A protein has these predicted regions:
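Adenine-nucleotide phosphate-binding core of ATP-dependent small-molecule kinases
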Residues: 215-258
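Glycine-rich phosphate-binding loops at beta-strand->alpha-helix junctions
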Residues: 14, 267-285, 306
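Short glycine-rich phosphate-binding loop at a beta-alpha junction
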Residues: 63-75, 252, 266-276
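A short acidic Gly-Thr/Ser loop motif
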Residues: 8-14, 74, 156-161, 180, ...
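Short glycine-rich, Thr/Ser-proximal phosphate-binding strand/loop in the N-terminal lobe
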Residues: 5-46
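Glycine-rich phosphate-binding loop plus the immediately following alpha-helix
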Residues: 36-40, 120-158, 163-219
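Glycine-rich phosphate-binding/hydrolytic loop that grips phosphoryl groups
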Residues: 284, 298-328
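Short beta-strand-loop/turn "lid" adjacent to the catalytic site in phosphate-handling enzymes
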Residues: 58-105, 110-130
Length: 328
């Protein structure tokens, strides 16, 4: 039947399930449930049901038995299936493997062993430098090419939460997070701007209007600049695409301000991955308003970004298997 492994990547909004056999991807599905949906016990049961259904679907469709389940992201948090404590940075891939939590959850799958990967915490509790990762650590270790293992690289992840992460010579060392992705969703769905921009995934990013939004936020403030987006549409004749780009610029002004200390670090490469519209808006502002960056900039497509957690979790699992074999 082969060695079938299910990889679970739990996000704030969605949970992705990928079935692999050895190193080949067999199937994948995404369920619209995440950390933002599971703040009470009843909704946590929905997450358990979603995982159970995904396992049953994979096993039935592909006539297989899943024996190993690798899980990372918010599914390992207090609103997930099993809470795993964060590791204190700096953290290398081998440390993630050492601290992985194996367990049985027979009410979800009677046969599989679950392996829950810990997140990473940074700084001191209550300090301005405190922050956390859950899930992005496996994406970053999935993105590191063998020839880059000992380099210094900045990663910027664009999703429900935007993050800039510093990888230094084998370990993840620093991280800064913003809530810009969730803010964009809230603005587009629960404010008066809903009628001004429509569905946010329908439009591309227009650099010139991103920069207008950035400059408005820089000159005024966050809240005032957002209302200016509506004024620009009503009085200034902005299209929905231009208005949305303006809002991206406002969010990028906030992000670049938060990310600036790490952007000033000397690194070999800057890697952008995740949601493409955010990445394009970030580049439109970084090139004009950000600190001078002399290293290489690599932009991963959304499709490439989706594969990173699979690669990273596979590498963590291979590290575990290698250590077990060495101890026999």
């Amino acid at each position: 039947m082969g060695n079938y492994i299910l990889i679970i990547d739990g996000g704030t909004t969605n949970t992705r399930f990928t079935l692999i056999n050895e190193t080949q991807i067999i199937d994948y599905i995404t369920k619209r449930i995440g950390a933002s949906d599971t703040h009470d016990s009843a909704k946590n049961q929905r997450l358990e049901q979603a995982v159970r259904e995904a396992i049953e679907h994979m096993e039935t469709t592909h006539h297989c038995r899943i024996g190993t389940i690798l899980a990372a992201g918010m599914i390992t948090s207090n609103v997930g299936l099993l809470e795993v404590a964060h590791l204190q940075a700096p953290v290398a891939l081998s440390q993630l493997a050492d601290e992985i939590k194996p367990c049985k959850l027979p009410h979800i799958s009677p046969f599989a062993t679950f392996y829950f990967v810990p997140g990473i915490k940074f700084g001191t509790p209550g300090g301005c430098d405190s922050d956390v990762l859950r899930g992005e650590e496996t994406e970053i270790y999935g993105a590191i090419a063998p020839e880059d293992k000992h380099k210094n690289i900045l990663f910027v992840h664009f999703g429900s939460h935007n993050k800039i992460v510093l990888y230094e010579g084998g370990s993840i060392t620093q991280n800064v997070t913003t809530i810009s992705g969730e803010l964009l969703w809230a603005i587009a769905n629960h404010t008066i701007l809903k009628s001004s921009i429509g569905k946010i995934d329908q439009y591309d990013v227009v650099d010139a209007y991103v920069q207008k939004g950035y400059e408005a936020a820089q000159q005024h403030n966050f809240s005032r600049s957002l209302f200016m987006a509506r004024i620009n549409q009503i009085i200034g004749g902005f299209t929905r695409e231009q208005t949305l780009s303006f809002i991206y610029g406002i969010l990028m002004q906030s992000d670049l301000s938060a990310f600036k200390p790490l952007l000033n670090e000397r690194v070999d490469k800057l890697v952008l991955y995740g949601r493409g519209q955010f990445a394009k808006a970030f580049l439109a502002c970084l090139n004009t308003y950000g600190p001078a960056f002399n290293g290489n900039i690599e932009l991963l497509s959304f499709e490439e970004s989706e594969q990173l957690s699979i690669k990273g979790l596979t590498r963590v699992y291979q590290d575990i298997i290698g250590k077990e074999a060495a101890n026999q």
